[in-house]
Amino acid sequence: MHFIFYLILLVSAADYGNFGTYPKVPKTASINGFADPIYDLLPDCAKECVKFSTSNTPCPYWDTGCFCVMPQWAGLVGQCVAQKCKGEDVASARFLATSLCSVVGANTWMMPASISSMLSTAAGDAKEVTTIEGKTAKSWVTAPGSAAGSVVSETGSASETGSSESAQSTTTGSSSTGSSSTDSSSSSSSSPSSSANFAVLQTGGIGSVILGFMMYLLV
C-alpha cells in the first residue's frame, strides 16, 4: 500500500513538474474543470450530472484531464446521465464528454464497464453525434497545437472496455425530450463561452492517466 502511495506521488510530480512539455488547461473553474467547458452545451437533463463533488478524487478542481481518468468520479457522472436522460440526449452528453477528454489529451473517459453499458442502453437507437453548433467533431475538438483527428474512447476499466466511441463518431444535431440525455445540439446551441473554453484547453501529461489507473486500483 505504501509503495502504491509513493508511486502516485512520484507520478504526480512527474506529471505536473515539467510544465513546458505539454499544453496547459485553465487553473480555475466555476463548477469544476470537467463541467465548465461543456456545461452550456450539455442537454438540460445532464447538466446536474457534472456537478458531483470531486472530493473522491486526488484531482485539483480545475484539472480536466484528471477527471477523465477517474472512474470513481466519471462513473457517477455516467450513471446520472443514463438515469436522467434518454436517446439523443445521452448520445450528445457522451459526445461532449469524450470530445472534451480528447481535447485535453486524456483520450479516454474512464468509467466502470457496467456504467458504460447503462449509457448504451439509455441511448438506445439514437444516432451518434459528430456535430455541435454546425462544427464537425474534428475541427471542433482539435485544440491549437494538438494532433487532428485524434480518437477518444469511453473505457470501462483497466481490464474491461465498455462501449467505445470516437470523437469523430456519429452525428445528429437534434434534441430529445426534456428529461433525455443525448447529443442535443439544440439544448446546447449557442454558447460562445463554452467554445472559447475548448479553444484554450490543451493536452495533459501521461502521468494523469497513470495516476487515474493507480487510484482506480485503490478504490
UniProtKB/Swiss-Prot annotation:
| Segments of this protein annotated with the region Disordered | 151-194
Q: Enumerate the spans annotated as CFEM domain.
A: 17-126
Which segment of the chain is annotated as a signal peptide? 1-13
| Cystine bridges | 45-85, 49-80, 59-66, 68-101
* Primary localisation category: secreted
Query: Which Pfam families does this UniProt record tie to the protein?
Result: CFEM
UniProt lists compositionally biased (Low complexity) regions at 153-194
Propeptide at: 195-219
Protein name as annotated: GPI-anchored hemophore PGA7
Native source organism of the sequence:
Candida albicans (strain SC5314 / ATCC MYA-2876)
Organism phylogeny: Eukaryota, Fungi, Dikarya, Ascomycota, Saccharomycotina
